[in-house]
């Protein structure tokens, strides 16, 4: 083995150096490394054969020669690896570079829902008029939704086909999803210690109806003003001011029609001139019924008040020419992109 090994090593070294220098990728270089320095490589085989040499001095000399070869190949492979990695980085920099002169891809930014826009507009208008916003629960009892509002037990609104009742009672009270936000007005009047009361109550309401102009859930804002000597003239001024501000038309034609609501007397429905050819209802209002004051512990001989209820969806449909109420809840991105608003518009 001694003579054979001494003759093979120079040839093996030349062959290994050539293969290392010829490697064009890190994968090729790894194959060369394994063939020479791996567990089953040539150098490992030389060391295995070295065990068979009995002469200690020769074994030491041959081992030194093999070690020199191993270290040389290891160093060459490390140098080549550094070169290949640098070339790989340069290739990526040249071929995957970002051209900073190119325009950026447009970022998809969400849009504010038209109902959010209208709700904010309405709240802001009434805030400037001195109305304070209040909140209340979506699940209410019959007293706050019907009884306190002078709605008799035989009224159609109390039937199950119109109202979503819950199966379980709380404190022997029948519970339901509120059909209007007037229930928040009742709560505000019951808590009131000082006057005037000047509030708007906005939120979701629920009725068992679904078509192009009705949905089982929709949004409503109701206003209430209670003080001494409140009259219909003050109510009309408030409604006129609100509608003119909301639609941005000081010449907007508005009319009040006699109507009936169990919680107001007198009552009126308010219409605006639509497309100069017909009138369309936008809200209901009236002077608070004395029975309502009596139900919440307010002296109706001293105090009076007015109330109004506004459908947020109805206002949005009129202002932005939306024909189908159900579109508000379809969650279609294309529709929201068309009818939505930039968030900066939500003042």
Curated annotation (Swiss-Prot):
Entry's Gene Ontology molecular function annotations: ATP binding; magnesium ion binding; phenylalanine-tRNA ligase activity; tRNA binding
Subcellular location: Cytoplasm
Cofactor binding annotation: Binds 2 magnesium ions per tetramer.
UniProt GO cellular component terms: cytoplasm
Binding site for Mg(2+): 265
Pfam family, any one: tRNA-synt_2d
Catalytic reaction(s) noted: tRNA(Phe) + L-phenylalanine + ATP = L-phenylalanyl-tRNA(Phe) + AMP + diphosphate + H(+)
Chain segments annotated as transmembrane: none
Assigned EC number: 6.1.1.20
Cofactor(s) demanded: Mg(2+)
Assembly and oligomerization: Tetramer of two alpha and two beta subunits.
Stated name of the protein: Phenylalanine--tRNA ligase alpha subunit
Organism: Wolbachia sp. subsp. Brugia malayi (strain TRS)
Name of the gene: pheS
């Amino acid at each position: 083995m001694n003579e054979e090994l001494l003759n093979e090593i120079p040839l093996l070294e030349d062959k290994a150096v050539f293969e290392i220098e010829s490697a064009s990728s890190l994968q090729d270089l790894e194959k060369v490394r394994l063939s020479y320095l791996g567990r089953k490589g040539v150098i490992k085989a030389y060391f295995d054969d070295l065990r068979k040499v009995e002469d200690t001095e020769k074994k030491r000399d041959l081992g030194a020669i093999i070690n020199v070869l191993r270290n040389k190949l290891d160093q060459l492979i490390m140098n080549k690896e550094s070169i290949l990695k640098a070339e790989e980085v340069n290739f990526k920099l040249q071929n995957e570079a970002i051209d900073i002169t190119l325009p950026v891809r447009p970022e998809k930014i969400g849009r504010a829902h038209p109902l959010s826009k209208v709700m904010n507009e309405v709240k802001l208008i009434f805030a400037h008029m001195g109305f304070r916003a209040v909140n209340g629960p979506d699940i209410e009892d019959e007293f706050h939704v019907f009884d306190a509002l002078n709605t008799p037990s035989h009224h159609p609104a109390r039937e199950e086909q119109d109202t979503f009742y819950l199966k379980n009672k709380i404190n022997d009270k029948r519970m339901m999803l509120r059909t209007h936000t007037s229930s928040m007005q009742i709560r505000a009047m019951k808590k009131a210690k000082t006057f005037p009361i000047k509030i708007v109550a906005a939120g979701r309401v629920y009725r068992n109806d679904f078509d192009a102009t009705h949905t089982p859930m929709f949004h409503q804002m109701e206003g209430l003003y209670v003080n001494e000597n409140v009259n219909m003239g003050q109510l009309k001024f408030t409604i006129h001011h609100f509608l003119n501000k909301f639609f941005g038309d000081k010449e907007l034609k508005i009319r009040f029609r006699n109507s009936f609501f169990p919680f107001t007397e007198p009552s009126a429905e308010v219409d605006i001139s639509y497309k100069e050819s017909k009138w369309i209802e936008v809200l209901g209002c009236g002077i608070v019924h004395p029975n309502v004051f009596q139900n919440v512990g307010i002296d109706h001989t001293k105090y009076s008040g007015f109330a109004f209820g506004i459908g947020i969806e109805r206002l949005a449909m009129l202002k932005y020419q939306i024909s189908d109420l159900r579109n508000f809840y379809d969650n279609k991105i294309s529709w929201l992109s068309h009818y939505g608003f930039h968030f900066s518009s939500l003042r």
